[in-house]
């Protein structure tokens, strides 16, 4: 009996010694490298990132600074990550598994890999995929916190955008040529006020006809007093510097099919049309003209009843008992009801995703069966589709983004420094034993 107790005590002692030894090793591996407000950076995190950076550098034949300098950079990054992670928790920012999976899928696609191949590549490089996945989540949270915090500190004025647009246009305008059509409605050299008024009335009528789709060349041949009238008013291809100043100021950066005028000159009233453009990147986007009827479910109107109600409207339209416009005015909820559900011309991408998806499957003049969006239940009538020149809007967006990015880089650094200055950060010296 004594022997058994002694054996148990000895075994217990060995277990305690082993546990103590393991704990000591764990403490050595997971020693606190830094305290960041209410969080910590562990030595194991520092070492893992150091190993990962060295592996990537070796793979890319990239030289690295000394271990000491590299460790300082790694510590800075992990401290920043900890700060931003804590801020993200306070702000309620969460990255769902679905968002994370989508990001990883995009990363794999950029490397021209399937997700399974991408995962294996991470494992082959000596990193746990689960750990890699969580690191990506941390990066996404950090990015969201940074963007939310820095964005509100940046202001880009319309004047700044206009100034940059002018510079961008000057740099590219010499390469752009416009194919112009010209109609001149003459008035006498010694024109009276009546002559001027009559010429302007004729010119205004010509512009109205052109805007309604009349043939430019035909009107030029019959009405223009310009030397090129018999050529359909064709002035040929000209860049901005080759045009009369009065024309160039009005034509510059205008899209194809733009009609400018009437413009009063010494000879009469000029009407100019941009027949075509070359040498400029033209971006066209599709717009749709649609009408809809919206029914919002409520406590007294279930989803099923809302859907059934809309299907009934479609049946009435098919039977010729009512028009879409009449039903929209009577039943649709929202501001478009007074217009018979007319949404006007718009880029379909600007609508709710479910609405955009529904429009993509429709043909001109067709109706879409009832479907659910974030606003409620809809039926749609697609009136028409068209392609429009979105170059000017694209350039404006690009100019804004350039200015925003310039300011973002500087402001992000300033904001992060302020955030670190306000935080409690204690870095512990590395134990070299």
UniProtKB/Swiss-Prot annotation:
SUPFAM superfamilies: FKBP-like, Triger factor/SurA peptide-binding domain-like. The keyword Transcription regulation does not apply. PROSITE patterns: PPIC_PPIASE_1, PPIC_PPIASE_2. It is found in: Periplasm. Residues 1-24 form the signal peptide. One of its GO terms (cellular component) is outer membrane-bounded periplasmic space. Its EC number is 5.2.1.8. It catalyses: [protein]-peptidylproline (omega=180) = [protein]-peptidylproline (omega=0). The PPIase activity resides only in the second parvulin domain. The N-terminal region and the C-terminal tail are necessary and sufficient for the chaperone activity of SurA. The PPIase activity is dispensable for SurA to function as a chaperone. The N-terminal region and the C-terminal tail are also required for porin recognition. HAMAP family: Chaperone_SurA. NCBIfam families: PRK10770.1. This is Chaperone SurA. It comes from Colwellia psychrerythraea (strain 34H / ATCC BAA-681).
């Amino acid at each position: 009996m004594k022997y058994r107790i002694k054996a148990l005590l000895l075994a217990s002692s060995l277990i305690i010694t082993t546990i103590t030894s393991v704990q000591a090793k764990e403490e050595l591996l997971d020693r606190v490298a830094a305290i960041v407000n209410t969080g910590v950076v562990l030595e194991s995190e520092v070492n893992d990132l150091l190993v990962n950076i060295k592996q990537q550098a070796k793979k890319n034949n990239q030289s690295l600074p000394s271990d000491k300098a590299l460790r300082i950079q790694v510590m800075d990054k992990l401290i920043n990550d900890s700060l931003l992670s804590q801020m993200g928790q306070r702000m309620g920012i969460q990255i769902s598994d679905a968002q994370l999976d989508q990001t990883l899928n995009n990363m794999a696609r950029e490397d021209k890999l399937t997700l399974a191949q991408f995962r294996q590549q991470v494992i082959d490089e000596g990193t746990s995929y689960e750990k890699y996945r969580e690191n990506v989540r941390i990066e996404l949270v950090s990015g969201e916190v940074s963007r939310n915090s820095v964005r509100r500190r940046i202001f880009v004025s319309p004047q700044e955008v206009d100034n940059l647009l002018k510079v961008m246009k000057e740099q590219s305008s010499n390469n752009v040529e416009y194919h112009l059509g010209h109609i001149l409605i003459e008035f006498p050299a010694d024109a009276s006020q009546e002559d001027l008024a009559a010429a302007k009335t004729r010119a205004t009528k010509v512009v109205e006809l052109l805007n309604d789709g009349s043939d430019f060349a035909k009107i030029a041949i019959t009405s223009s007093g310009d030397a090129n009238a018999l050529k359909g008013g064709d002035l040929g291809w000209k860049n901005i510097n080759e045009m009369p100043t009065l024309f160039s100021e009005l034509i510059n950066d205008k899209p194809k099919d733009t009609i400018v005028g009437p413009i009063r000159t010494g000879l009469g009233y000029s009407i100019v049309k941009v027949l075509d453009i070359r040498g400029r990147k033209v971006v066209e986007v599709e717009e749709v003209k649609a009408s809809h009827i919206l029914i919002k479910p409520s406590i007294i109107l279930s989803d099923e009843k809302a859907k059934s109600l809309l299907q009934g409207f479609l049946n009435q339209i098919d039977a010729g008992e009512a028009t879409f416009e009449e039903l929209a005015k009577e039943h649709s909820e929202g501001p478009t009801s007074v217009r018979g559900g007319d949404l006007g011309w718009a880029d379909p991408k600007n609508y709710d995703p479910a609405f955009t998806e529904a429009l993509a499957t429709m043909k001109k003049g067709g109706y879409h069966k009832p479907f659910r969006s974030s606003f409620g239940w809809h039926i749609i009538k697609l009136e028409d589709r068209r392609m429009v020149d979105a170059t000017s809007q694209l350039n404006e967006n690009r100019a804004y983004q350039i200015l925003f990015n310039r300011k973002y880089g500087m402001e992000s650094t300033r904001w992060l420094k302020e955030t670190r200055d306000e935080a409690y950060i204690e870095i512990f010296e590395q134990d070299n034993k």
